[in-house]
């Protein structure tokens, strides 16, 4: 089938709502963990057609056709907080290209390293459903499955507790001093009086 052919790919009624041409120029896929969830970024780069397409969580956010300059960058937003993301397209040799993702002006690796210092993440299973809880240490915002939670803070003898609910479940994040300068404050998620282990993203 020629690439410009508009004829259907399948003869029966079971054909998918997209053609096989969709995503044929897919060159890079990244997963980015933000407070509101893990986002999938896909990038198509047609080196012969000059096409550039960016998808975030399966939705097209940028489409450019007939770009004569094959190197450059595409900038867009990801997630509820509209986090700035940039895909850099660089020539490495001949017709080979390198694709790198920056989040808030940092390489993805550097961003994730910084993020692990500024957030805590827990994953738990309640009432037959999976939940991802994220604490942003700088703002003390709590996110659960992509939604910013309403919280109530309270001082206790050995630190603070930030209370919120997941469904009918009482939850709080307890913050206590580690007593060690390098470790700083230790945050623990307690759900129904049970501590949930933290995960590293």
Swiss-Prot record:
Signal peptide limits: none
Family: Belongs to the FAIM1 family.
Protein name: Fas apoptotic inhibitory molecule 1
Gene Ontology cellular component list: cytoplasm
Entry's localization field: Cytoplasm
Chief location of this protein within or outside the cell: cytoplasm
A Pfam family assignment: FAIM1
Gene Ontology biological-process entries: apoptotic process; negative regulation of extrinsic apoptotic signaling pathway via death domain receptors
Claim: Lipid metabolism is one of the keywords in the record: no
Name of the gene: FAIM
Function: Plays a role as an inducible effector molecule that mediates Fas resistance produced by surface Ig engagement in B cells.
Species of origin: Bos taurus
Alphabetic keyword roster: Apoptosis, Cytoplasm
């Amino acid at each position: 089938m020629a690439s410009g052919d508009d004829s259907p790919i399948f003869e029966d009624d079971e054909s998918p709502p997209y053609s096989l041409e969709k995503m044929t120029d897919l060159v890079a896929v990244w997963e980015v963990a933000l407070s509101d969830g893990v986002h999938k970024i896909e990038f198509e780069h047609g080196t012969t057609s000059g096409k550039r397409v960016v998808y975030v969580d399966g939705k097209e956010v940028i489409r450019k056709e007939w770009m004569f300059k094959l190197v450059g960058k595409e900038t867009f937003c990801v997630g509820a907080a509209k986090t700035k993301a940039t895909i850099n397209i660089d020539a490495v040799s001949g017709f080979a290209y390198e694709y790198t993702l920056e989040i808030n002006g940092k390489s993805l690796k550097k961003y994730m390293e910084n993020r692990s210092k500024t957030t805590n993440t827990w994953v738990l299973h309640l009432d037959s459903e999976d939940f991802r809880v994220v604490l942003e240490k700088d703002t003390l915002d709590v996110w659960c499955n992509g939604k910013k939670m309403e919280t109530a803070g309270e001082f206790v003898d050995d630190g603070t507790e930030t209370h919120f609910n997941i469904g009918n479940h009482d939850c709080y994040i307890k913050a206590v001093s580690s007593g060690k300068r390098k470790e700083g404050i230790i945050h623990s998620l307690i759900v129904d009086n049970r501590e949930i282990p933290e995960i590293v993203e």
